[in-house]
């Protein structure tokens, strides 16, 4: 994954490569799981037990799920990135959340799995802490895609081999929101530029939303509908007829970073990073609440 990140930094890989290569890179991980565990049976949530029973063997679908999880984790941090301290900061919060969860579960039935996770997470946390010190605003070290892919795959490995992949996904709540919000651009339903970073205004010293500009007629009916619905719910800002002939439309790039700027207005980079990391902390608090309270509605704990 480090090599993939380096290749992306140097070669600017297309999105289809970013999906294909992590899938291939996850094969050794899936082989380790198959050789050492091989368990593909899940506990069915309470609302579905009358139809599916208490347990259900997913077979190969479980490996498909784990492969998709590895691809998501690898790219999740990479698409919520681009301002000083955000990549290392969100990785720190997620790692701290996983460590806390592992410590809580040490007295449970899966002690060895959580000790295994701690062997990875504790060194990762402290090395990332040192990186964050130099990566925070004003940054003296830049992480690039190399760190993002490495961090994401590290989380995927401990989540899969530590048998807490569902809980680990809960620690990715901001990344899931960012992914869902970004889907129209990631699937090119709405034109997606190579970089979707916020725009720096040298006059104010603040970051502003960046925009995607495209011909209005080039947008598909589905893209037009998504844009209209998103605009109605104030999720995007749309400027129509931005040229003298009225042929072009602009909309803000669909990232969580731009959405926060849309809500709060132009923001200093240090403040913006702090707000996004605060969202990550709030997401982890929600994750623990779901894991230890709301879970009772779906499972016997």
Language-model features, listed with the residues they occupy:
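"…together with the soluble PPM/PP2C metallo-phosphatase catalytic core" -> "…together
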Residues: 1-189, 195-202, 287
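C-terminal membrane-associated helical module and adjoining short loops/tails
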Residues: 161-301
């Amino acid at each position: 994954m480090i090599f993939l990140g380096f290749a992306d930094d140097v070669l600017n890989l297309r999105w289809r490569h970013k999906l294909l290569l992590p899938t291939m890179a996850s094969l050794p991980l899936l082989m380790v799981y198959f050789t050492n565990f091989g368990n593909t049976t899940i506990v069915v949530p309470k609302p579905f037990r009358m139809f599916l029973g208490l347990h259900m063997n997913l077979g190969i679908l479980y490996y498909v799920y784990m492969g998709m999880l590895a691809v998501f984790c690898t790219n999740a941090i990479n698409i919520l990135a681009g301002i000083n301290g955000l990549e290392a900061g969100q990785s720190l919060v997620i790692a701290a959340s996983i460590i806390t969860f592992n410590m809580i579960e040490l007295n449970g039935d899966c002690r060895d799995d959580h000790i295994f996770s701690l062997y990875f997470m504790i060194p990762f946390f402290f090395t990332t802490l040192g990186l964050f010190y130099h990566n925070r605003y004003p940054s003296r070290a830049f992480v690039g895609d190399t760190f993002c892919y490495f961090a994401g795959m590290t989380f995927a490995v401990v989540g899969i081999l530590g048998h807490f992949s569902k809980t680990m996904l809960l620690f990715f709540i901001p990344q899931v929101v960012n992914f869902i919000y970004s889907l129209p651009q990631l699937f090119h339903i709405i034109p997606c530029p190579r970089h979707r970073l916020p725009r720096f205004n040298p006059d104010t010293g603040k970051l502003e939303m960046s925009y995607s500009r495209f011909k209005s007629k080039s947008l598909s009916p589905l893209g037009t509908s998504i844009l209209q619905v998103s605009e109605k719910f104030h999720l995007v800002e749309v400027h129509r007829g931005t040229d003298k002939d009225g042929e072009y439309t602009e909309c803000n790039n669909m990232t969580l970073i731009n959405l926060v700027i849309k809500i709060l207005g132009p923001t200093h980079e240090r403040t913006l990073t702090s707000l996004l990391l605060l969202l990550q902390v709030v997401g982890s608090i929600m994750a623990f609440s779901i894991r230890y309270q709301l879970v009772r509605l779906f499972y016997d704990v």
